[in-house]
Amino acid sequence: MSLRLSGGRKLQSPPGSTARPTPARVRQAVMNMLSADLPGCSWLDLCCGSGVMACEAIQRGARRVVAVDQDRRMAATARGNLALVAGAQTPPANVTVVQQDILRWLRQGVSACGLEAALEEGASLAGFDLIYADPPYASGLYPQICEAITGGGWLNAGGLLLLECASAQKPALPPGWSVVKERRYGTSTVLMLKPTEDPTT
């Protein structure tokens, strides 16, 4: 399968992959929706697959990007794609790819997740301004991801969590989250969420 960013750059897909990449139409709509938030932001991509959403975010000014997937082939592909796109920016974006079970990694918390070595010199470990989660639609992981983000201090104050899910089966959300926007794109829906309380308190 051939993947292209909205700007036309070609990306790689894992060979023989049955992954479900976010459609170009959805990617473009999400990036437009976040246009004011992306420049200079920190972006966490959960169940990143080929890394295409994180690549789109980098093209639009994200400065610190972490992409996580438990599949070895997916993580390797994301690493190559993100290095290509990040290296084309001036200065290059700070990119880290993690191959690990999503929930196990999130539940460590941001202070114990092993990202310190990837920080720029003089920077302190912090959460993320924007988090995008796109697990397999039928996985049932959405509530657990939300809870792990809250419990682990992953979201900065004023930050947003975006969930990509099936339009026909939107997930039930745990307490502590409210829907800011909901956009349907055919069989896919994107929910933009924020905590009902400041996540840093």
Task: Tell me the role of every PLM-derived stretch.
Residues M1-T201:
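Class I S-adenosyl-L-methionine-dependent methyltransferase catalytic core
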